[in-house]
Amino acid sequence: MQDRFTRRGIMATAGAFALAAPVRAADKEPVFDDSEPTRGVAIPSVQHTDEMAAAPLIKKKVNKLWNDAPTIKEPNALQFTPTGTLLILDQVDPNKVFEVNPSDGKILRTVQTESIHGSGITIDGGGNWIITSTKALQGPPVTLVVDPKSGKTLQKWVTPGWGFYGPDRPPRPGMPPETPSGGHDVKWAGNGRYWMAVPASGRIFLMDEASGKAVRSLVAPVNRTHGLAIDGNFLWSVAADFYQIHKLDPKTGKIIAKIQLDKKSDPAIHGLEIRDGVLWYCDAGSGWVCNLT
């Protein structure tokens, strides 16, 4: 196992980025120092707020398919395999990956990993898993390449833009200190690259797996981008706090359309995946796995 890198620049300084208005993908990429957390990125921007309001609404029905609790306690990410089974990342630490039959949720196998508070899983071009850890026992949060049979970490690197998302929050008496956040969902894009949402940075990164560096990034539409899914020429992203799923142009990050769920009756949206044009999602809070039709 090796650390691919500990410091690199992919975006201007973290402090400058925190004060600057979000830019589109075509603008100059800011730079993050991996040794220091990002703080206080103010999103969503007025531009994205207007886009969310104006985006056409795609009406979908939420189907609650199955719930494997208490075995799978906190399903936080989904990934279909080439054989049609479904991988579920449980964020209970240290994280386990469950391979299940998507038709009924029957657990086919379980793999223990070294991930901590994982929030994203995908399969790379060589069949290994890429898992994002939103937290860390020590040091900054990392992204892992994992052996799908043993669960052992093959490689790891510091997640770009890790830190504290949303506005700065002063310490509250009697409350534990705020912990930094790393990557949320991750999805393989082909050609050695994958998309990764990092809420603290206010960005969705297109990453190069071989170098562990960002190729480019999109300004995230919201403060807490969670799940991701790739559908042909479009990228879907979860706006968890809004109970929305956004259809994005992966070249510009523009919101093309949105799906609105009901906060009162529908399970919350965390992990996201798509299969045969149907979006699937999971809720780490209630344990439900759902799809949208």
What are these regions (language model features)?
Residues 1-17:
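N-terminal secretory signal peptides and thylakoid transit peptides that target proteins
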Residues 47-71:
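A short helix->beta-strand "capping" segment at the edge of beta-propeller domains
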Residues 62-68, 106-111, 152-157, 166-176, ...:
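A short beta-strand motif characteristic of beta-propeller blades
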Residues 70-82, 114-125, 161-189, 221-232, ...:
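Beta-rich, blade/repeat-based domains predominating
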Residues 88-92, 131-139, 196-200, 237-242, ...:
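Conserved beta-strand positions in repeat-built beta-propeller and related beta-rich domains
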Residues 96, 138-142, 246, 288-291:
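Structural motif
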Residues 101-104, 147-150, 208-212, 249-253, ...:
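Short loop/turn segments that connect beta-strands within beta-propeller blades
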Residues 273-293:
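Blade-level signature of beta-propeller repeat domains, shared across WD40, Kelch, NHL, RCC1
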